[in-house]
């Protein structure tokens, strides 16, 4: 996912399915966890990836994110569980995937529990830092690119440069917006 730790913007979740046919081509690129890549490279690679993989993403802008957060009991993990499971089910319907790898955000394995209706032949792995698996890295790149595009739209809407993250530039952006 992308946007979870940012002060501004919404939330984007993505799932990617790789096949034997596209795995090697993608593995030969510089794609890795989006946190280890610069944003310009992410924005260049995401469209290329989208042409080559099965993927589904859910892009919640701030208002919709806030509505969904409330609808999920003001619990971001419950919302993330539904978003991840929804994306994974859409991608799983596109092919015969033997394994599903999920970047774990809760020790209770909520996405695994939500996906129990998938094929008994599907191995579900939910672990922290799952971006070491290529499909999860690809999903992180696509989600980050979508989030960056979302921030660009929001910046244009309010006519200020909205900072990424949650650090020091956020306070200055809030002051500029109030002014």
Regions from the PLM with identified roles:
Residues 1-179:
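RNase H-like, Mg2+-dependent phosphodiesterase core
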């Amino acid at each position: 996912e992308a946007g979870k730790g940012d002060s501004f913007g919404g939330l984007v979740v993505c799932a990617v399915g790789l096949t034997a046919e596209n795995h090697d081509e993608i593995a030969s690129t510089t794609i890795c966890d989006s946190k280890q890549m610069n944003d310009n490279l992410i924005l260049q690679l995401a469209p290329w990836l989208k042409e080559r993989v099965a993927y589904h993403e859910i892009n919640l802008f701030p208002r919709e994110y806030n509505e969904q957060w409330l609808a999920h009991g003001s619990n971001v993990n419950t919302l993330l569980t539904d978003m991840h499971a929804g994306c994974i089910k859409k991608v799983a319907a596109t092919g015969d995937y033997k394994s599903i790898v999920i970047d774990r955000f809760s020790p209770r394995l909520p996405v695994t529990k939500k996906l129990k209706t998938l094929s008994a032949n599907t191995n579900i792995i939910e672990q922290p830092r799952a971006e070491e698996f290529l499909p999860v890295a690809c999903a992180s790149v696509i989600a980050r690119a979508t989030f960056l595009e979302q921030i660009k739209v929001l910046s244009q809407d309010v006519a200020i440069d909205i900072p990424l993250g949650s650090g020091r530039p956020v306070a200055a952006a809030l002051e500029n917006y109030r002014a």
